[in-house]
Amino acid sequence: MFEKKKRLGLIVYLYYNRDARKLNKYGNVVYHSRRMRYSVLYIAQDETDKIIEEIGALKFVKKVLPSYIDTIDQNFVGSLMR
């Protein structure tokens, strides 16, 4: 049967927009902002350290940040009643 793999989101800030498509070989690019010059991509969680180092060493990458969506409390019950 199919097993769901754990994934991690990465925010990659770029120097130039034309280099955004080069990130496709590292993971699934789900969003690219041309105005802010960043891309959001998902990678397998078991390979995160290696891939973050590889992407960070590329000449067209300004910085790489991991997504913190897993650490944010997503229980919104009662937050609208304040």
UniProtKB/Swiss-Prot annotation:
Its main location: cytoplasm. Keywords: Cytoplasm. InterPro entries: DUF2129. It comes from the Bacteria. It is found in: Cytoplasm. It holds the Pfam family DUF2129. The keyword Cytoplasm applies. GO terms for cellular component: cytoplasm. Belongs to the UPF0298 family. This is UPF0298 protein SMU_1670c. It comes from Streptococcus mutans serotype c (strain ATCC 700610 / UA159).
